[in-house]
Amino acid sequence: KTHEKGSDEGHFMAAVVCLRRTKQRINTDEFDVMEVVDGQQRLTTLIILLNAIKLKFGEKDKGEAKLLRELGELLVKEGDELLLLQTNHDATHYFSDFLRKGTSQPSKKAKTLADREILEAVEDCKAFVTRWMSDGKTLPDLLSLLKNRLFFLLHEIDSEKAVYTVFEVLNNRGLDVSWLDRLKSILMGAAFELKNINHAGTITELHNIWRDVYSVIGLRQGLSTEALRFAATLRAVEAPSRPLGEEASVDALRSVATTVKSIRDTASRLLRVTEACDAVTANVRINSVTRISQARLLATAISLRGDIDETQRKPLLARWEKVSFRIYGMLLNDARTRVGDYVRLAWQVLNEKLPVKSIDAAIREIGSEFTIERAVDALRNANCYEGWETELRYFMFRYEEHLAKQQKLNFSNEQWEKIWMVSPSESIEHVWAKSRAPVKQRHRLGNLVLLPPKLNSKLQDDDPKDKAEAYRKTGLLIAGEVADFIKAGNGWNKTAIESREEAMLDWAAREWAD
């Protein structure tokens, strides 16, 4: 748009806030080294765009060759050693490799949010330069526009102590800055405000802790929110009745971070909670159980108890899994159900150091109203497909484990790894095809099975007798069992569906009972 307005028009990009560090001499020139406090994204994008332009210049044309050298000297200094801009979160060297070598990876390969932002910016800038040229405009025109008609306002600060205060003020402008980032700036600022401490050592340690926090979070932005809320909820003075919100969590953690020890402990505790949350949510096997926030909170609290060894923790989490699946999976209660009980118990697990037996008894008590008899009845002759896909996948996985144990076979996870990687609908198979089955039998538990991804769409409307061999070839015991049912009876009908359903419900009544 600035280009179309004519050569007399400019565009104000942003105010950039920088911390002045030291001077650095390059040959006979002296430069100031500046740390960007605010405006990093715009500057990074601008530099990536300049490099994308540089990569399009050729050396045969004298004019382009001159511009190529100028851009190269601007972006990379001192014999390829010093970059014009260096980023804090470039452990994978995506940014530096693009500036030095002109190479880049697809953004889908990114493992962290910071890496994804860099790689997407590279893709966007390269695509923009290509479009600019395809529209008949020249690269020198684009470079001239960037050099002469885009403007920044530079605000310099000369004290690192002021960095975090400035950052917090800037974050109150209504910009979309995560509450976790705000907490970081608050804690770092509080550390600088303290008197008579080793600021350099403390700040370095805090930087390392926060680096680890962001590394664990990776691409899962929701994990930063959950870790923050859980850390504050579990740190509350009294047992809360529900998880704290993000803003309340920042306020709560800020209030206790008043000394160097408490600041360090707050950051370290947040890291441990982040790691525990990651372990709970990363287990795709139980994602039908962990879809409820307070259930995840309790599992996180149990995982954080360092004095409970694995031989004790495993049965506790098994109890938690049984009760939670009965309440939220089999009986389909929503997140309002027993929220206070879960949250208070999670707080007590950590703050009152409840014994293992007491934790187990408390989990049993939470589930006492939600009996296995009610849960099984809820699945009998019910629609176990629409709205229950995730729970069905978990149910079938657990049933597969049971069949392997029953037949004294080693459980094979190979096919299940593929099943977990796709949405449940890509693996759920109606033995009696949806288009042919009577309405009352169509979505019943006994008519459903899981197959390797996409196989269900290949089989589609085939007669169950014609599907049996394909089921057996999958290697899945649950599919093989269906093939056995078909072979043993007169095909697949209401009687077969009811018989298989009752067999699975008999097993479920034992598996998820207290």
What feature does the model see in each segment?
Residues E310-N333, T337, E469-D514:
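C-terminal, well-folded lobe of enzymatic/effector domains
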Residues F31-L43, F152-I157, V169, R173, ...:
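Short, charged/polar micro-motifs that form catalytic or ligand-binding hotspots
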Residues K56-K60, G174-D176, L304-R313, E401-F411:
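Short helix-capping/linker segments at secondary-structure and domain boundaries
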Residues M34-R42, L142-K147, H155-A162, N287-A295, ...:
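Secondary-structure capping and boundary motifs in well-ordered enzyme cores
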Residues K1-D32, V356-V482, I486, A496-R500, ...:
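Betabetaalpha-Me/HNH-type nuclease active-site subdomain
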Residues K1-R235, E469-A470, T474-G475, V482, ...:
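Glycine- and hydrophobic-rich flexible loops that cap the catalytic core of alpha/beta enzyme folds
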Residues F151, W179-H402:
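A cross-family structural signal marking well-folded subdomains
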